[in-house]
């Protein structure tokens, strides 16, 4: 590298998301202009695709996690109340990927209306190393789609 040339955001080809570029820019300012070395953690960044329905993801996929260690998968699909009331066929999918050994939630995946909103909050829990039991101890907000994240009690499959 050249000492006087810096790069952040998409040009680095690390994680091509606007909030990552903003975080990298702020870290650059802190490091270079405030003499406060500030690394950016590029692990476990939640992301969403704003299609219809939305898709949100954070952490490892089922396939990636299974290559690393034995896992449990908690998955559900259901018709959300808003679709039922409107007579629409829309369905929701939610999945938690859990380490069998440590019980840490390794990944969370949502396909649903407002999945981007839900995955942002799930991302905090996953980033903090929450366990499946931490999710289970959380009281659900009812009636919501996201309550399924804390009410899935039986693994769908183990690998």
Identify what each model region corresponds to.
Residues 45-49:
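Helix-loop-beta segment of a Rossmann-like dinucleotide-binding subdomain
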Residues 1-44, 102-103, 144-145:
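Rossmann-like dinucleotide/flavin-binding elements
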Residues 33, 50-61, 66-159:
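Flexible, glycine-rich terminal cap/loop adjacent to redox cofactors
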């Amino acid at each position: 590298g050249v000492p006087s040339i810096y790069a952040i955001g998409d040009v680095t080809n690390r994680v091509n998301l606007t909030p990552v570029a903003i975080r990298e820019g702020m870290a650059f300012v802190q490091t270079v202009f405030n003499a406060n070395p500030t690394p950016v953690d590029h692990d476990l960044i939640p992301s969403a695709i704003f299609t219809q329905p939305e898709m949100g993801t954070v952490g490892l996929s089922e396939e990636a996690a299974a290559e690393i260690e034995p896992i449990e998968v908690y998955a559900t699909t259901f018709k959300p109340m808003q679709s039922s009331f409107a007579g629409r066929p829309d369905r929701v999918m939610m999945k938690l990927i859990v380490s069998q050994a440590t019980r840490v939630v390794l990944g969370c995946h949502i396909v649903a209306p407002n999945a981007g909103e839900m995955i942002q909050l799930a991302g905090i829990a996953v980033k903090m190393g929450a366990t499946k039991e931490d999710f289970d101890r959380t009281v659900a907000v009812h009636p919501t789609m996201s309550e399924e994240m804390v009410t899935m009690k039986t693994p769908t499959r183990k690998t």
